Each structure stands twice: as C-alpha cells, then as structure tokens.
Amino acid sequence: MVVDDSAVVRQVLVGVLNDAPGIDVIATAADPLLAIEKMRQHWPDVIVLDVEMPRMDGITFLRKIMSERPTPVVICSTLTEKGARVTMDALAAGAVAVVTKPRLGLKQFLTDSADELVATVRSAARANVKRLAARVTAAPLEAEVKHTADIILPAQSGRALAQTTERIVAIGTSTGGTQALEEVLTALPRVCPGIVIVQHMPEKFTAAFAARLNGLCQIAVKEAANNDRVMPGRALIAPGGKHLLLRRSGAQYFVEVLEGPPVNRHRPSVDVLFRSAARAAGSNALGIIMTGMGDDGAAGLLEMRQAGARTVAQDEHTSIVFGMPKEAIKRGGADRILPLGAMAREIVTQLQ
C-alpha cells in the first residue's frame, strides 16, 4: 500500500512498484484515515508511507500500526532538514527503511531511484516482523554496475598491521540498522573504544540520525567530517552519499570522508570501511556486521578477520533482515555470532 497526500507521487510510486516482478500495489490512500479503512479490507505486506500528511500525521499512523499489527513500513521522505528529523522519529517508531521522495519533475526519480525503491520494498517484505514488534514495544541501489571495495581502496599484497595499541570498533548495517544502532550505542558507557559506523542511508538524513543518537547516548555521536579523530567515547557515522575510511597517523586514528562510485551499489559502503579498518587497525579492531539486506560488508569483515581483528555477526533471531550477517557468516568472516543485546558488552571488552 502507498500512503501519500500527493496524487502525483502516488501515481509515480505505484507505477514503479507495479512494474517490478513480484510486487502488487493493492491500494493507495491520500491520508492515514483513508488507509485505515482500506486496510480493514485487505492488510498489505508492506506500507510505503509519507510522514507529513493531513488529518493524521505519518508518525501517529505508524505507531498505531505497530501497536495493532506490526507491519514493515518504508518511509518516503523529502530531502529537507525538517523531513530528516521527522524521518528519524519514524525510524525510531518502527519503520524499517527510508527512501527519498520523487520531486515534481519526476524524470530523475524514474532514472536514478526506481531501483532503490523496489529493492527497499523487497527488503522490507522480508523483515522480521516479530523482532520489529519487540523493538517498538520495548539502503540504496545506486548503480547498475556492482563495484567492489577495490575501486576505492585497491587490494594489497601482504599484510601491513597497525603499530598501535589503541582499540577501535567498526560497525556496518543497513535495513533495520537505525533501531539496532540505537539499542547498541545507548547501552555503552562513556568509557568505550572509538567507533566508526556505516549505516546505509540517503544523504542529509545521517546528520539528523547522529544528532538524535547523541541526545540519547552517554557517548558522543556525530556525523563524520573529513579528518575527524577517532576517540574513545565517541562514535562517528558516515555521511550519506560519501564513503568513510579509517586512517592512522602514528598511534592515532582519524577518518577520511570521500566521494567515489558506489561499492556493492552503496555509498557509504561497509566493505570500504571494513577494508580500511583491517589496514589501519589490524588486530586492534573489532568488526561488527548487523541487520541488513544484501552482502555489503561480508568481504570486508573477512579481511578484518584475516588481519587479526575480532569479528562479530548479528544472529538471525534479532536481525530485522538477516542478509548482510548471513553472507558474512557464509564467507567465514565472523568468528562469533551474537544477539543484538550482547553487542555493547562485546564492544566494552575491546578495552580489556
């Protein structure tokens, strides 16, 4: 079901989704109250939802859905500061993913973002609904060519390990990751290793996400800027639309934020971060791959393990989408498989 107050946007979204094999839009609605009437007749598997609508706002509607019958919800939001803030509230309320809303001149959306919408809806349809409900009560395909991390950080022969004792943590996640990261980071004490994070998310949304977490956590959380130092008690989140690399200067770590083609169809890419962590930190790193669709991060986690790092994959039971962790486990990249609730404790042990 598509719920949006713009008839033009509804028409475009429905056209894109109905053209995709295996997807059938059973209904549309101009506001949540109309949506509720239609859902009583036929409940959808996935809802694509605008968050700013008349009569009932999208957040209230989302909370109603999650309390009555948890259902995967994809937020379709505008690329504005206000839209980003509201979208963060929606993700906290149980939405599984966010896509950017098409603008009125819809050619660019049809060219650049249709595949992302379809992939996100398919990913949402596979979401662990029971886990979604438990959370509430308690990324983008950008290119046809699938690049590897080699295009950003070419593979090396031999191993160049870090000569430093400072510990760092690298985390990669996608669908369901905003809720997972909130659960992990809010459980951390002020004294913990420096953390670098890739969460698949459109540009302009990561700053609002980082600001929200910063207000909830004991540690500091910010959107990464080029040359930011990785410090104990602080987490840096890759900005949407940019790659994030870990670098080292002497005994200190810092990050590089750079442009470049999508890797595994994502920018930022988890593989890029993990490969850079393997090179910069070696055995002083902990790599964690969590809920998400696809295989981004699977190759990079294996590289981290081969460089001597401890590596962890989230288990299937607590993952919203058991795609990225499953692929990492399959390739031998994870030396441990842990539930989400054990991740914070695992991070703290990096200090020991």
From Swiss-Prot:
InterPro entries: CheB-like (IPR008248), CheB_C (IPR035909), CheY-like_superfamily (IPR011006), Sig_transdc_resp-reg_Me-estase (IPR000673), Sig_transdc_resp-reg_receiver (IPR001789). It catalyses: [protein]-L-glutamate 5-O-methyl ester + H2O = L-glutamyl-[protein] + methanol + H(+); L-glutaminyl-[protein] + H2O = L-glutamyl-[protein] + NH4(+). It is an enzyme of class 3 (hydrolase). Its main location: cytoplasm. It holds the Pfam family CheB_methylest. Signal peptide: none annotated. SUPFAM superfamilies: CheY-like, Methylesterase CheB, C-terminal domain. GO terms for molecular function: phosphorelay response regulator activity; protein-glutamate methylesterase activity; protein-glutamine glutaminase activity. Keywords: Chemotaxis, Cytoplasm, Hydrolase, Phosphoprotein. The keyword Cytoplasm applies. The modification 4-aspartylphosphate is found at D50. The keyword Protease does not apply. Phosphorylated by CheA. Phosphorylation of the N-terminal regulatory domain activates the methylesterase activity. Residues 162-352 form the CheB-type methylesterase domain. Its EC number is 3.1.1.61, 3.5.1.44. SMART domains: REC. One of its GO terms (biological process) is chemotaxis. HAMAP family: CheB_chemtxs. Involved in chemotaxis. Part of a chemotaxis signal transduction system that modulates chemotaxis in response to various stimuli. Catalyzes the demethylation of specific methylglutamate residues introduced into the chemoreceptors (methyl-accepting chemotaxis proteins or MCP) by CheR. Also mediates the irreversible deamidation of specific glutamine residues to glutamic acid. Belongs to the CheB family. PANTHER family: PROTEIN-GLUTAMATE METHYLESTERASE/PROTEIN-GLUTAMINE GLUTAMINASE, PROTEIN-GLUTAMATE METHYLESTERASE_PROTEIN-GLUTAMINE GLUTAMINASE. Contains a C-terminal catalytic domain, and an N-terminal region which modulates catalytic activity. This is Protein-glutamate methylesterase/protein-glutamine glutaminase 2.
